[in-house]
Amino acid sequence: MGKFILDSQFAPAGDQPQAIQKITQFIHNGAQYSTLVGVTGSGKTYTMANIIANLNIPTLIMTHNKTLAAQLYSEFRGFFPKNHVEYFISHFDYYQPEAYIPRRDLFIEKDSSINEDLERLRLSATTSLLAYDDIIVIASVSANYGLGNPAEYLTMIHKFEIGQEEAQKTLLLKLVDMGYTRNDTIFERGNFRVNGEVIDIFPAYNEKEFIRIEFFGDEIERIGVFDALERTALTQLESFVLYAANQFIVGAQRLQSAIKNIEVELENRLEEFVSQDKQIEYQRLKTRTEFDLEMIKESGICKGIENYARHLTGKKAGETPYSLLDYFEQKGKPYLLIVDESHVSLPQFGGMYAGDRSRKEVLVEYGFRLPSALDNRPLRFDEFINKAPHFLFVSATPAQKELELSQEHIAEQIIRPTGLLDPLYEVRDADNAVLDLYDEIKARIAKNQRVLITTLTKKMAEELSKYYAELGIKVRYMHSDIDAIERNHLIRALRLGEFDVLIGINLLREGLDLPEVSLIAIMDADKEGFLRSETSLIQTMGRAARNVEGKVILYAKKITGSMQRAFEVTDYRRTKQEEFNRIHNITPKSVQRNVEQELKIESSGLSRLYEKASKKIPKSERESIIKELNIKMHQAAKALEFEEAARLRDEIARIRTM
């Protein structure tokens, strides 16, 4: 079994040593649920890393949004550079699920756009899970959604060995069964190509390397690893294991069984519609399902094939669907599931099932889908919370649910390694908030510090951003329409000083590690509600706890109950921290953290790879690269993807001028 090797120049400090020791002991003693109550800036992520290293078991870390997942992915890759750290979030750039609105007789077709890089990372996560024990997967709520059967996925692997006897035709058919596509013109992820007795395979889960299998007759003579950009040999292998091109691969026998079961279900459902005299629903379901069945018989896939997941995976009606957690269980060993920011993540996990169910029940009732489509769903909360052998809930403000589950298995982490105290806070009159805050912003900019402002409405955030920009402040506005990658870019740009003030609504609370921020301004702090609850206020105020000059200004007309309770928690923690510093003669210092490289994810993996390494492209290779890009450019234009076509055109022009 691979061993986790934690790489850090720091030793645990503050409350970290006792928290690490307690949680490790809880889990060693068999506790299924434990909670780490850690104040903002106390190094909860580093504590988590130490716990993982101590336990030395596969670990899944789940959080409620993609921004935090990206941040955790960067941090854990830094902590465990010699181990396998993977990333598993939704692979959609855009997703509109199918739905039916009866009162308007409006059917909305499913519409989506898959991000190829995110798909590759998801595949990398599942293949690594089956191949390695020293693995950490950072995931969003996507981990709770349906995946293919991991046991079936394991049957869809192929091992190559030097000296192995295998007819080339047989191998090519096997590659197609595994989801790979032959393409002798454009060679990219998920493709293979054939040139005489040489077969090149580009694993769907690999970004930079492809495999070359060289035959002598029907015998494998050589196995090589090649750089996908430079087409140069990297190393020779004695053997190589290839995994399927997607997680929903189904063997021929299972597929035939699924088709038969779908036909039986369709027949039964149509009989129900006849008995209920529902002619429209009858015709609708018959037409749609028979079309899908024809597509599955011909090509093994159809649009919306996930709605037949129950049949394709061999599950029974109502049975728990397969998810990423089953890939951990497939290993047959204990594993740890960490729920980061659990006070937000757990309620979100709990709400996923109900929303999905209500939408699909309408589709089933009106004949758009078979009843089995209801089993293509996220895990219910009761299924999720009993799935893993060991849960660790991590939060500065855990909810009652986590505390009840954990009982006595709770560790506190209030003392920060840096000696930093919970921030000072001040309540100011809301009437003069905008001008008063402008003066505070100018003072912070003069010290090369950053400011976060949280508002209650999108309109106020937009107007405030526009107003301060007109006054010469470098300000940006983070709103809910910004995708995960752009949010990550904004946060990084703030840290680098490309702008000084970031304004948002509820996007500035959990998990944002911003040592450069010394001022948090909370507008309309006295407006009771979700965004100004005790928990939300504590979390928001905590964003200023990574800077020695951290301060929070709450603009309000009165002090609400939520504000008062948040102040009491802050005062309690600050008193305890001051006492610890006094006893140990500690002088508080701001957190020092490098600005990690951005998670490089774009819509066109091929173009990005060429752009990233264009300076390395040998002159002799440029024409072949230009040829490939030119084909992709015309394909994009034909598909009316003009922005992508223009980007590829510019890339071609740039390579030609090198």
From Swiss-Prot:
Boundaries of every UVR domain copy: 623-658
GO molecular function, one term: ATP binding
Domain Helicase C-terminal: 433-607
One Gene Ontology biological process: SOS response
Domain Helicase ATP-binding, chain residue ranges per copy: 25-416
UniProt note: domains: The beta-hairpin motif is involved in DNA binding.
Protein name stated in the entry: UvrABC system protein B
Organism from which the protein derives: Helicobacter hepaticus (strain ATCC 51449 / 3B1)
Gene name of the record: uvrB
